[in-house]
Amino acid sequence: MTTPDTLMLPARPEPIALPVDKTAVIVIDMQNAYASPGGYLDLAGFDISGAAAVIDKIKGVLDVARGAGMPVIYFQNGWDSDYVEAGGPGSPNWHKSNALKTMRARPELQGKLLARGGWDYDLVDALKPEPGDIQLHKTRYSGFFNSQLDSVLRSRGIRHLVFVGIATNVCVESTLRDGFFLEYFGTVLEDATHQAGPDFVQKAALYNIETFFGWVSTTADFKGAVGQREGAG
């Protein structure tokens, strides 16, 4: 039952109770790199055609979350302009990052992809943070790795994380998994996420999450649960 203090969110594999004062919305990497034509994913050959719809879904989620008093935490993924944080050949990231590989294959892009301070790194215009929102940076797929996220959450008593953003199968899943290991309850809103790769990787990521690491819900159910809370108040 939804009350003024708790949302009962319909989800898979079962509904989950979200205490409003212990829940934050985590916005993963809604940057030009991942959601805009001419950004890194687009230049690397990934299909970003679903990103526009995801942006609209996220806007609706953030509006109701802010209205309910939930913290909104934005992540941006990338590195310093000299790519020191990306790691050199001794780092697996140097070998596996598609952004770094794309720049090595196309030298004219060197310094343009995921470089802090550049257009590619910037959040998309439609999802700029509002006063009171929190912005964090990360240099690897997981938002918990070498970032302030854990301390930001613990200092606010946050135990429940609602995830939106790109890419479902990479940074969203990586951050939710790491949160699971740190005793956070993670829920992803499936229609407010988009994958990097074929459709089947979206399905696989959501299967992994709902079966092993967390819960899967929708933007409509999230907004509906918030609305029921307001009615209960």
Curated annotation (Swiss-Prot):
Reaction catalysis annotation: (Z)-3-ureidoacrylate + H2O + H(+) = (Z)-3-aminoacrylate + NH4(+) + CO2; (Z)-3-ureidoacrylate + H2O = (Z)-3-aminoacrylate + carbamate + H(+); (Z)-2-methylureidoacrylate + H2O + H(+) = (Z)-2-methylaminoacrylate + NH4(+) + CO2
What Gene3D superfamilies does the record tag this protein with? Isochorismatase-like
Q: What is its EC number?
A: 3.5.1.110
Biological processes per GO annotation: nitrogen utilization; uracil catabolic process
Keyword terms of this UniProt record: Hydrolase
Residues folding into a coiled coil are none
Keyword hit for Hydrolase:
yes
The protein's superkingdom reads: Bacteria
The top EC class is hydrolase
Q: Where is the active site?
A: D29, K138, C171
Q: Where is the signal peptide?
A: none
Query: What GO MF terms are annotated?
Result: hydrolase activity, acting on carbon-nitrogen (but not peptide) bonds, in linear amides
> What family, per the record?
Belongs to the isochorismatase family. RutB subfamily.
* Primary role: Hydrolyzes ureidoacrylate to form aminoacrylate and carbamate. The carbamate hydrolyzes spontaneously, thereby releasing one of the nitrogen atoms of the pyrimidine ring as ammonia and one of its carbon atoms as CO2.
> What HAMAP family does the record point to?
RutB (MF_00830)
Protein name per the record: Ureidoacrylate amidohydrolase RutB
Species assigned in the record: Caulobacter sp. (strain K31)
**Lineage, highest ranks first:** Bacteria, Pseudomonadati, Pseudomonadota, Alphaproteobacteria, Caulobacterales
